[in-house]
Amino acid sequence: MRYAVLVTGPAGAGKSTFCASLITHAQTIGRSVHLVNLDPAADKFEYEPTIDIRDLINLEDVMEELEFGPNGGLIYCFEYLLNNLDWLEDELGAYEDDYLIIDCPGQIELYTHVPLLPRLATFLSTSLNFRTSAVYLIDSQFMQDKSKFFAGVMSAMSCMLSLGISMLCLMSKMDLVKDKKGRTKREVGRYLDPDPNLLLEDINQGTNSKFNQLNRAVVSLIEDQNIVSFLPLDVTSEDSVNTVLSHIDNMMQYGEDEEPKVPKDMDDGDFD
């Protein structure tokens, strides 16, 4: 069985750093993992990608030759990838019983406005028979701005519904908010398990009254759906990364269908 984790979220949320931490931890526990880069604009990685979309198409070349802007060029690159899925299938063909960590671009329009990442997720899970899940990261600094935080919640909800696969939401960079502003665990908990009333407490006072009805509609939507909650992520803590990996494994039922592997020396039948 093959496994794939799509690492998604807005730009600056810490996706690449999370990928590196996850790979480091997986290697320490003896798990075979591979990094797949799907960002044609990426410039550097802590771990060299095993599979890299830049070997197929490069954003800089697209922008120069077609005179596209960054977002239009990125969408073109992804459309090109989806029109050449045989390339991806060939690249993935050699990796049996392995765990792929797929670093995705930070432009949310790839899954909220155009169905590019959803099509990729479907291809992985149905055509290539990967057990596929996703994680969605938002920056813990969003807790300093409630309107920005709830925009992140709505974006996570949109991603979850668009991808149509199991998804884990992570509050990244928690190491940066420890002991700041005297936040108690209860206060942080209202963000990890989003309390819609947070939006109404201050937002209505700080915005034009004509937005009050919109704020109430957002609150009602979050309450009615009730599908987004966050797991805290501190990449400086091995326990935190291990907890996240355990949740991902549980989503994909990792290892449940694997046959016990017999050590090679026992295979040979030589016990001398």
From Swiss-Prot:
GO molecular function: GTP binding; GTPase activity
Entry-linked InterPro entries: Gpn, Gpn3, P-loop_NTPase
Keyword GTP-binding: yes
Keyword Nucleotide-binding found: yes
SUPFAM superfamilies, alphabetized: P-loop containing nucleoside triphosphate hydrolases
Site (Stabilizes the phosphate intermediate) location in chain: N71
Keywords carried by this UniProt record: GTP-binding, Hydrolase, Nucleotide-binding
Residue numbers covered by motif Gly-Pro-Asn (GPN)-loop: 69-71
Biological process terms in GO annotation: mitotic sister chromatid cohesion; protein import into nucleus
Binding-site residues for GTP, renumbered to this chain: G12, A13, G14, K15, S16, T17, S172, K173, M174, D175
Entry similarity comment: Belongs to the GPN-loop GTPase family.
Function noted in UniProt: Small GTPase required for proper nuclear import of RNA polymerase II and III (RNAPII and RNAPIII). May act at an RNAP assembly step prior to nuclear import.
Protein name (record): GPN-loop GTPase 3
Species: Cryptococcus neoformans var. neoformans serotype D (strain JEC21 / ATCC MYA-565)
